[in-house]
A protein has these predicted regions:
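N-terminal, polar/charged subdomain of small-to-medium soluble alpha/beta proteins
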Residues: 1-106
């Protein structure tokens, strides 16, 4: 599985890269056919509300795209949320495939 991490208005440091790769890398245990995950991390500055960190993920598997967004005041929390939502979506997709395959075996 290829993980591509990019930053928008944010420098991707080695600790951020390693943390993101660790979190996103866990998806492999739920679904083997993930080809690539593109993660874009960004920050929006606000004088009144503080910084808002965004994590956008686009997962490619078996000709399917799964797109997820997460926002939080903390970058690492946004990455955690992105990983959790991607995990749920991958599980849901995998169940959908299982159900589809079961229906076709009658």
């Amino acid at each position: 599985m290829k993980i591509i991490i990019s930053g928008k208005h944010l420098k991707i440091t080695e600790p951020i890269k390693e943390y993101t790769e660790e979190k996103i890398g866990r998806l492999k245990k739920y679904f083997d056919n993930i080809l690539e995950v593109d993660v874009t991390l960004s920050v929006e500055h606000s004088k009144t509300e503080g910084d808002l960190h965004k994590a956008d993920g686009l997962l490619f598997a078996n000709g399917t795209k799964i797109r997820v967004e997460a926002e939080n005041n903390d970058l690492y929390a946004a990455i955690d949320e992105l990983s959790d939502v991607l995990e749920r979506q991958v599980r849901k997709y995998k169940e959908k495939l299982k159900d589809h395959n079961k229906k076709g075996t009658h």
